[in-house]
C-alpha cells in the first residue's frame, strides 16, 4: 500500500523512468545486423597482359539464408573469366569466397556486385529470404595498368 501511495506522489518523469527500467530498453535499434559484408581485393597496379586475380569474400549477419548472385562489372570490356557469374546460398555461418583470374591492357574500374535474388534450388529446402530495403550491394576498385 505504501508503494502505491509513493507512485501516486512521484513525478511523471520518475514514473516513466521506472517503466522504462522495468520493461527494458528496445534492443532492435542497437542490434542492427548487416545484410551483406564484402571484402573485395584486387591489386592496385598490374603490367600489360599480366594475369590479375580478384578475390571477393561475401558474408552476412542475418540468421536467415539468402540466394546471392555475384559477378564483376567494369567500365571497359574485359574478356575471359572476368565475366563469370556465381549463384550460391549465403548463410551467416559460412561466408562465400569467389575468385576471378583475368587479363587487361587498360586501367579499369571494377565493381564487385552482389545481387540478392529469388531462385529455387539453391538454398537447402528453398529456405531463403530477400531483403526489402535493398537487394544490390557493390564495391568499386581501380586497377591501374602500367
Curated annotation (Swiss-Prot):
Keyword annotations: Disulfide bond, Glycoprotein, Pyrrolidone carboxylic acid, Secreted, Signal
GO annotation terms (biological process): proteolysis; regulation of immune system process
Glycosites: 105
Database matches in InterPro entries: Ig-like_fold (IPR013783), Ig_E-set (IPR014756), PIP (IPR007990)
Main location: secreted
Intracellular or extracellular location(s): Secreted
GO molecular function term, any single one: aspartic-type endopeptidase activity
Modification sites for Pyrrolidone carboxylic acid: 29
Residues spanning the signal sequence: 1-28
Annotated S-S bridges: 65-91, 89-123
Keyword Disulfide bond annotated: yes
GO cellular component annotations of the record: extracellular space
Highest taxon in the source lineage: Eukaryota
Family recorded in the similarity comment: Belongs to the PIP family.
Subunit and partners: Monomer. Interacts with AZGP1.
Name of the featured protein: Prolactin-inducible protein homolog
Source organism of the structure: Macaca fuscata fuscata
Amino acid at each position: 500500500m505504501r508503494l502505491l501511495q509513493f507512485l501516486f506522489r512521484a513525478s511523471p518523469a520518475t514514473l516513466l523512468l521506472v517503466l522504462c527500467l522495468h520493461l527494458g530498453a528496445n534492443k532492435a535499434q542497437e542490434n542492427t545486423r548487416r545484410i551483406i559484408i564484402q571484402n573485395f581485393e584486387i591489386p592496385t597496379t598490374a603490367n600489360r597482359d599480366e594475369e590479375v586475380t580478384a578475390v571477393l569474400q561475401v558474408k552476412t549477419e542475418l540468421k536467415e539464408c539468402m540466394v546471392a548472385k555475384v559477378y564483376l562489372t567494369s567500365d571497359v570490356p574485359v574478356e575471359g573469366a572476368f565475366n563469370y557469374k556465381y549463384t550460391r546460398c549465403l548463410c551467416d555461418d559460412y561466408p562465400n569466397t569467389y575468385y576471378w583470374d583475368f587479363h587487361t591492357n587498360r586501367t579499369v574500374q571494377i565493381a564487385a556486385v552482389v545481387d540478392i535474388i529469388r531462385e529455387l534450388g539453391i538454398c537447402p529446402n528453398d529456405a531463403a529470404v530477400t531483403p526489402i530495403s535493398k537487394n544490390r550491394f557493390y564495391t568499386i576498385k581501380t586497377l591501374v595498368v602500367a
